[in-house]
């Protein structure tokens, strides 16, 4: 029995219709139907506010952020924008685009943590705009808005968009490459109508039309920037998505089920060649080389081949062939990591993949929708599958797959909601149940960590209430029809992610003790200390030292002690284990002047310096010494 309900709230992504058992007419695939007002404004404002909330003042957290930030600062200070250097040592782990972006922000806004993180935030916004464009053109304006905000509102994107790392920049470039290439065959859905033919863009028996030369050059230039960002994967990755997708479209358009196996094989070969011709490989490669090659050649000449050898052989081939830096995992690592990284939208991702696969293989699905879903599924599979085969694994390696996941979830969710299929469905109940579980897990994780070295962060556990309350709002909206449950889901994801990577993360980052220890060393030295480390050094120490840090290995204890005795402004950072090795031979007048316990470590980091400094200076340091 149909139930009446009030008109839904006037949300920019709501569908204006009852959401109980009544089935309002679904908007057409080309976006005709309920008007969606100002989608660009909605996405830009919502994304900008969410990203801004995440910019709480906090020190660099992991090992990568301070390392990359220090390289960019060195470029700005030395004027050498070609050779990346870290602590006066050649840095071969990443190309130069990220460092250039950070250094440019340093020049505009000063050298600090927030300017180093601005490029990632702008890149995340650029990816959201690409998803808005793709979702709108390939499905509907509502799908475009939901896809863009689902991207902004998932946990790993929130983290990477506020990190001084290259992954958000790489994802923006690869997403725009994929979208611009696919548009030529997907095009505005109105041109494809709602026909269910095999492909309205590629006529039967014909090769796909080639990319316009200008667009091919633009895609190649973006690929060149991606190669400058993270190496060959930035160019190869999008092509590994587009080429098989175009070939599949051409093969389906010309397929004759009654033909012999030999003829079908020849048709498949023609489709593959047509896909290669479609991308205009000569223009594409020349444009990529025009952007990327000058720097690669310059850095190779300046370093006598050391930088290219280290980057390509160690950080590309080496990382793929063997685990590096203890970053290993099984074949399902990235699939499981996405359940956390794509949260809260990951709670609906498995169901959305099943529905999208079913829709993409049905002949009665409108051709534009079928092609768009097929592209999204292939896009997701290529990036996740390729890095699942690599030996070295980190969750951020598959960040370029997250835009595809956002499109798949958005297309599925908007279709089901617009059809009025959310009156107590099992899929919604299951998904919201996992959303609630994620909120409980967030709170529990922070509370447990607070008992194991993460002090003063108990209040950050409140962020776990957001998914719980948001899931309740989604469920109530679906049952009562008073507002759009999809709008509630978008809202909870943005609020949760914004708070989790902003105020909550700032509380957690306060437990990062190494920056405070380095500042204490500077104060002990009367302004600027000359720092050395014995046995262990970290990028955090190098960045906050604001100068060169001598790194002494365990077998170099004599040199470390001689260095410590070289002046009153020289301090030595050691672990408790390292101190036990050198303590009997410490120079006269030196000793422990400060210590902190790094997060989740069993021992302290210690400052060894002059103990006969003036009392006022000692008083300043003892306030932070336990």
Describe each PLM feature range.
Residues 2-4, 10-12, 20-422, 595-596, ...:
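Membrane-integral, polyisoprenol-dependent glycosyltransferases
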Residues 24, 33, 217, 221, ...:
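Membrane-embedded architecture of ER/inner-membrane glycosylation machinery
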């Amino acid at each position: 029995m149909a139930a009446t309900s009030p008109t839904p709230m006037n949300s920019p992504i709501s569908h204006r219709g009852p959401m109980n058992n009544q089935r309002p007419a679904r908007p057409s695939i080309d976006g005709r139907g309920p008007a969606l007002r100002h989608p660009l404004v909605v996405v830009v404002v919502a994304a900008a506010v969410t990203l801004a909330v995440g910019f709480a003042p906090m020190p660099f957290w992991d090992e990568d952020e301070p390392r990359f930030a220090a390289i960019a600062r060195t470029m700005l200070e030395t004027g050498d924008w070609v050779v990346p250097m870290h602590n006066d040592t050649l840095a071969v782990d990443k190309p130069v685009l990220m460092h250039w972006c950070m250094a440019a922000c340093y020049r505009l806004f000063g050298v600090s943590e927030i300017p180093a993180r601005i490029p990632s935030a702008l890149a995340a916004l650029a990816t959201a705009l690409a998803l808005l464009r793709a979702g709108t053109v390939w499905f509907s304006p509502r799908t475009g808005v939901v896809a863009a905000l689902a991207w902004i509102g998932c946990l790993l994107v929130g983290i990477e968009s506020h990190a001084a790392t290259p992954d958000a920049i790489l994802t923006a470039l690869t997403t725009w490459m994929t979208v611009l290439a696919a548009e030529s065959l997907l095009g505005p859905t109105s041109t494809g109508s709602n026909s269910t033919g095999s492909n309205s863009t590629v006529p039967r028996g014909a090769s796909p039309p080639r990319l316009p030369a200008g667009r091919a050059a633009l895609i190649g230039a973006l690929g060149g920037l991606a190669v400058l960002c993270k190496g060959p994967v930035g160019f190869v990755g999008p092509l590994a998505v587009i080429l098989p997708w175009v070939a599949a479209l051409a093969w389906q358009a010309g397929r004759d089920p009654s033909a012999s196996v030999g003829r079908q094989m020849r048709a498949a070969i023609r489709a593959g060649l047509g896909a290669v011709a479609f991308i205009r490989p000569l223009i594409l490669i020349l444009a990529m080389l025009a952007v990327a090659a000058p720097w690669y050649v310059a850095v190779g000449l300046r370093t006598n081949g050391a930088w290219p050898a280290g980057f390509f052989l160690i950080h590309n081939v080496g990382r793929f062939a063997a685990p590096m830096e203890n970053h290993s995992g099984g074949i399902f690592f990235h699939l499981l990591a996405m359940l956390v990284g794509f949260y809260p939208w990951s709670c609906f991702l498995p169901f959305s993949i099943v529905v999208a696969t079913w829709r993409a293989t049905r002949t009665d699905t409108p051709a534009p929708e079928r092609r768009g879903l097929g592209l999204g599924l292939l896009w997701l599979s290529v990036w996740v599958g390729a890095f699942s085969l690599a030996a070295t694994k980190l969750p951020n390696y598959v960040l370029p797959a997250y835009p595809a996941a956002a499109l798949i979830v958005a297309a599925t969710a908007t279709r089901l909601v617009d059809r009025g299929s959310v009156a107590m469905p099992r899929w919604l109940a299951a998904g919201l149940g996992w959303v609630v579980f994620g909120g409980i897990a967030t709170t529990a994780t922070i509370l447990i960590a607070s008992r194991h070295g993460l002090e003063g962060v108990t209040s950050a556990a409140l962020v776990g209430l957001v998914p719980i309350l948001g899931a309740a709002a989604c469920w109530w909206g679906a049952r009562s029809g008073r507002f759009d449950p999809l709008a509630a889901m978008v809202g909870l994801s943005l609020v949760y992610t914004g708070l989790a990577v902003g105020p909550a993360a700032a509380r957690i980052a306060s437990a990062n003790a190494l920056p405070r220890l380095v500042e204490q060393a500077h104060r002990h030295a009367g302004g600027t200390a000359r720092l050395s480390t014995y046995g262990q050094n970290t990028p955090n120490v190098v960045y906050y030292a604001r100068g060169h840090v001598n790194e002494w290995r365990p077998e170099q204890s004599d040199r470390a002690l001689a260095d410590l005795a070289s002046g009153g402004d020289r301090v030595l950072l050691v672990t408790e284990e390292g101190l036990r090795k050198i303590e009997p031979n410490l120079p006269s007048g030196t000793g422990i002047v400060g210590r902190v316990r790094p997060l989740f470590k069993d021992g302290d980091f210690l400052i060894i310096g002059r103990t006969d400094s003036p009392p006022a200076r000692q008083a300043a340091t003892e306030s932070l010494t336990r």
